[in-house]
Amino acid sequence: MAGSHISIPTILKVGKNTLENLGSYLKSSGFKNAVLYFGNGLISMFGNEIMDSLKKDGITVLDYMELDTTKIEDIINLAFNIDSKAQVIVGIGGGKVIDTAKYAAYLRKLPYVSIPTSASSDGFSSASASLLVNGRRTSVPAKMAYGIVADTEILKSAPEKFIFSGIGDMVSKITALYDWNFEAERGYSEMNDFAVMIAKKAVNSFVRTPFETIHDDLFLRELVDSLAMSGIANEIAGGSTPTSGSEHLISHSLDKMLEHPQLHGIQVGVATYLMSRVQNHRYIRVNAIFEKTRFWDYVAVSYTHLTL
């Protein structure tokens, strides 16, 4: 039965300079031995700060490395070579390394802590991973994050396209929830009321957040919090239906059609507006948040260069 066992993060720290307190967060949860996976090029950027924080609080780093693969066979090999003394896996970076960390943790039945360096999608909080299986991008079961530590100073320093991608992915919950309800009313699906509530609260809280620019601390905190709640909604529902609907199917099609696809959340955001018009559902709200955040301005420039 979906939802009979639900995992949710124990640690959720979002704000300024949270990275320097990583050691204390792990120590408070009883962890002593950690394995760290960094995204490509990130050890030079964040390695010293993380190592110093862990050392200060008595956390032993058994192993650390940079990773740039999502091949399932590579991750299986990686997982079963993890030191037997490891108590927690920490993934620092974007989608690739977070997916690697959560799948390795899933295979070894270890908790993992997600440290996203951009807020481009809800992947850092979801219990699934997008991996290459026999050369094809495939969604596989993975570990729900034990902890999420997001430093807003790091998030705001990432290229703006990643923030716009997160905005698109977050707003897509509006059309995804409509689709889920549409299916349920016709007997093709069964809704989980609590998952619906969490997903609705996430997107509504986000679109109502007051802000001056998308680099505001409050805006970034709300974006990360809402994306994290989306991942929890999926966990409760036992699948991605609260957060992924027709707009995601359009994005998947674009991935196959375009020579150089846009970031996932950018494509999903554009498809969200299109589907909200088809659904005749909250398209004014969708357009308003995209205008205020300048999402449309970014799309207008970036889509000029697309080729089929």
Could you tell me what each predicted segment is?
Residues 1-88:
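ATP/NTP phosphate-donor binding region
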Residues 4-5, 81-84, 105, 138-143, ...:
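Solvent-exposed alpha-helices and their adjacent loops that cap or buttress functional pockets
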Residues 33-35, 87-90, 111-113, 146-148, ...:
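Structural motif
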Residues 82-104, 108-119:
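A short, small-residue-rich loop immediately preceding and capping a beta-strand
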Residues 194-296:
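Active-site segments that bind and position negatively charged phosphate/pyrophosphate groups
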